[in-house]
Amino acid sequence: MCIRDSKWGFNYSITGYFAKKVVYYQNAITQSSQVVYEYPFPIIRLGDLYLMYAESLNEATEGDNNVPEEVYTYLRKVRERSGLKKGVLGETEDIGDVRVAWEKYSNDPTKPKTKDGMRSIIKQERKIELALEGHQYNDLRRWKDASKELSKSIKGWNVQGEIEEDFYKVTTLFVPRAFTTKDLSLIHISEPTRRS
């Protein structure tokens, strides 16, 4: 199932998962050759800016039940760009609107109406939209969730499996390391000294 041959060495994924998102569409690897094209990958994307703006608006607003309409607007832009819009799955509701999606398809339909709920939703949207783009580590540190999230076991498929049934068994690959909040806290920036 995984690509492990003498020519390319260990050219395989330890988890069994392969990322297609950041791979140029003309790249190809076969048993006998490898074609790799370099391309300019965007460092900052518009979706990232929209999500940062929505998060900032949510955090800057006073009160817990006072989520600004603009937060929903910018989340909608990100969701619609990725294909979540009215009619895409045959539904009549606009699932690009996070309020509609959570009301219809979740166990907590009131979650988007509170500041804490929107914080959680924005975190989830960032994980989905910006997956494999190098944002998650610093997001986890900024949210102070790193010690909880990075201390979990890493799981994947059994890449040693020779048949499908063995390959697709979820396996614990790494036992979690113990991270502390101190290890993962942001670097302190002191106040600049004033010149008299």
Predicted feature descriptions by range:
Residues R4-L186, S190, R194:
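Acidic/polar-rich alpha-helix caps and helix-coil junctions
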